[in-house]
């Protein structure tokens, strides 16, 4: 158990589950999209749906979508900043099935780019992402994370793992899912540190890889992680 588990995260209140966790989930969705979104739709499940306004979940989700970390004081005026940056957003209630009560599905758009991420806020600012664009994956935002869409072909996972190992980077977790045999597949890979630029470029051009995003670790505050909080800038790889 860490000190964070005892005292909770540094954040704009009132609730680590409903504010810090929600903000981090939206921030991860933004990085998965790869650019500043122009449209955001939040489908709120369970406790999130019941307390979205009272606990600031709606503000936290919009702030994370704009690039903010949970300790950013501008979360309180996230709706105003969203208007300034041309972000259209709405939130609805939804039954997402047998999942954690603090769960949200985040659908982001920008031009012809779209991403849908579903995750849960587990308490203490901790989060778990378990679905991306219909693929069952698993990552926490506590490590740099690679999201790789590829064709379900023998050897792809091994080749990706070899590139990571050759870059002297250790894999913390690797989860793979596919729609059907021989069809589209997705990997979520948590790693101990970000890949070098050459390794990242090599992965993007690897045979059978069709899409790649590199997500930063989001469990630290905005200063430590050099966030692009509420800036509207593009920060992810193409």
Give, region by region, the residue ranges found by the protein language model.
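Alpha-helical scaffold segments in soluble metabolic enzymes
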Residues: 5-6, 24-32, 60, 64, ...
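A structural-propensity feature for long, helix-poor, extended segments
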Residues: 41-84
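Non-transmembrane, aqueous-exposed alpha-helical and coiled segments at domain scale
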Residues: 30-41
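A conserved regulatory-domain signal marking ACT and ACT-like small-molecule sensing domains
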Residues: 77, 89-94, 109-231, 235-238
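Contiguous domain-boundary segments centered on the initiation and propagation of an alpha-helix
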Residues: 66-115
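Conserved phosphate/anionic-ligand binding catalytic regions in large, soluble enzymes, centered on
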Residues: 8-28
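Short glycine/threonine-rich loop-to-helix capping motif typified by GTGT followed
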Residues: 51-59, 101, 185-193
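Short, hydrophobic/aliphatic alpha-helical segments
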Residues: 1-11, 40-42
């Amino acid at each position: 158990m860490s000190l964070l588990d005892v005292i909770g995260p540094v954040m704009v209140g009132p609730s680590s589950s409903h504010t810090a966790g929600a903000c981090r989930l939206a921030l991860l969705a933004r990085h998965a999209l790869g650019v500043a979104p122009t449209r955001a739709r939040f489908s709120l499940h369970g406790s999130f749906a019941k307390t979205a306004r009272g606990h600031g979940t709606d503000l936290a989700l919009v702030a994370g979508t704009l690039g903010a970390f949970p300790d950013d004081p501008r979360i309180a005026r996230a709706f105003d900043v969203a208007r300034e940056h041309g972000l259209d957003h709405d939130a609805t209630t939804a039954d997402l099935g047998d999942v954690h009560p603090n769960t949200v599905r985040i659908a982001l758009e920008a031009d012809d780019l779209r991403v849908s991420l579903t995750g849960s806020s587990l308490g203490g600012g901790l989060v778990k992402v378990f679905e991306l664009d219909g693929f069952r994956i698993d990552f926490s935002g506590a490590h740099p994370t690679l999201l790789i869409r590829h064709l379900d072909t023998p050897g792809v996972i091994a080749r990706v793992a070899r590139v990571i190992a050759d870059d002297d980077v250790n894999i913390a977790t690797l989860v793979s899912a596919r729609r059907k045999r021989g069809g589209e597949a997705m990997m979520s890979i948590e790693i101990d540190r970000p890949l070098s630029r050459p390794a990242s470029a090599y992965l993007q051009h690897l045979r059978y890889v069709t899409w790649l995003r590199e997500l930063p670790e989001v469990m630290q505050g905005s200063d430590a992680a050099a966030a692009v909080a509420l800036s509207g800038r593009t920060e992810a790889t193409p």
